[in-house]
């Protein structure tokens, strides 16, 4: 776990109206790396007097381990919805008190309906951001090695011959079996939501063929790797790729990054805000979620992280380059290519973990 100390220091802005230190209001947030506009937290503290203690993680597995162990110390966490389903069954979360979420009407029915697959009735979570898992790449480096600067197929990474051509300039993949294995299954023409041992074995066989060409499995380092021109391709989250694209453009070093939702399809996922069952600051957690539901706040968050959000009312306030980009807010043709995955049972999850360990270690 990475402690973002600047948040703990800068956003501890308290209304000191004679209140003792022991009475200070706090909300402890555990969110993904590079996943919020810092001034949002500062503004929340200025308005409410609630100190934000903000920690970050870079994989659902890290978050889940903490939650299942209990006594995490967090009041707000941001799991991916497909993970949240089994966490709800394990009693990890408490139901939201929607009477305290006074502007919940700003949420988007389309997103709520999809999240309800994992959280029936939308009782435990509110969407924060959503996006796709696809391919970000350095156009110049890919052109030099593959003879094209437009990627439209997963074959660029899953075909061993293609992957080998890119190995020297660097391929990164998410350290996430629930993102990469479904992509491999989908490429093989299998059900990306399959949990069967036979299908996992086929995905493992495919991944082991390209394993020598993969420089690293990591769920955040690829952002700067792409932006700095240190790697040529990454399989990762859509918004991260656009962050890399923006950073590369700002650096003015001739690095041009693009993002592709391949023709074969890609995973559509949802990151949600939820309150752990053992949260100590439940009122503050609801106040934080309600603040994040403000259209102007959701718009600022999306503009910063370049992800779509589940707040329909925010879209009119967002950067039009984001809302008009079909790789961020998919049009009908792009949506038709996207798939979602259903929750895995504990036994199925162990199968994923074993397969993933074999893939990452290469043996």
Language-model features and meaning:
Residues 74-79, 215-216, 232-237:
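Paired acidic/hydrophobic, glycine-rich loop segments that form the ligand-binding mouth/hinge
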Residues 271, 276-337:
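Mature extracytoplasmic/periplasmic domains
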Residues 83-86, 233-254:
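A ligand-binding cleft/hinge motif common to bilobed small-molecule-binding domains
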Residues 78-84, 88-213, 218-227:
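Extracytoplasmic ligand-binding site segments that recognize negatively charged/polar headgroups
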Residues 94-105, 155, 251-267, 276-278:
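Short beta-strand->loop
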Residues 200-209, 215, 253-274:
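Periplasmic-binding protein-like
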Residues 23-87:
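Early extracytoplasmic/lumenal segment of secretory-pathway proteins
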Residues 224, 332-363:
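Conserved C-terminal helix/tail region of periplasmic/extracytoplasmic solute-binding proteins
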